[in-house]
Amino acid sequence: MTLFNSPKVIDAFTDAKKVIVTMANNHMYDYPSKIQITASYLRSKNIGVFGICEKDGSVLPFEYEENGIKYAYFGHCWGLYTRTNTNNENNVRIVDHDYDIFANIVLDYVKMNPRTKVYCFMHWNYDREKLIMPMHRKFAHYLIDRGVEGVIGSHSHRPQGAEIYKGKPIVYGLGNFYLPSGI
């Protein structure tokens, strides 16, 4: 399955206060030549982009400040998906590092930016899975225990559980908003 939509879809978000998009999604490799084009187009529409590696391979969050509060968003795609749907066209890479490497990147940022609220958007779990994977719950707790403000998950195409852990939100699966629920 490949996913594609018209750039006109972005017009639906023109009145939104703030729009950010993670590109850490296994379907980004359906059209590898379009990843940078998509990121540039989104940025040109004042939409924050995160979840793709920089040209030098580094992982940077999308950062912004609102009402004196700084925010940073990191995106990650479970490497299981990118190993089966790879980018063989160019060197553009979505963030799909092993969890320990990704955690070190995020937690180094947290340490260097103690006043910034850091969130992680995780593309994980299996299609149509109802249950939260124990390793994902453990990883979300690990991130929160070390200073991340919240963890948001997606990919299973159906809502999954959520919890408030140590006063911070974890949403394991958002479900579908713009895809048919039959997927």
Protein language model features and the residues they cover:
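A substrate-binding/cap region within the structured catalytic cores of diverse enzymes
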Residues: 48-66
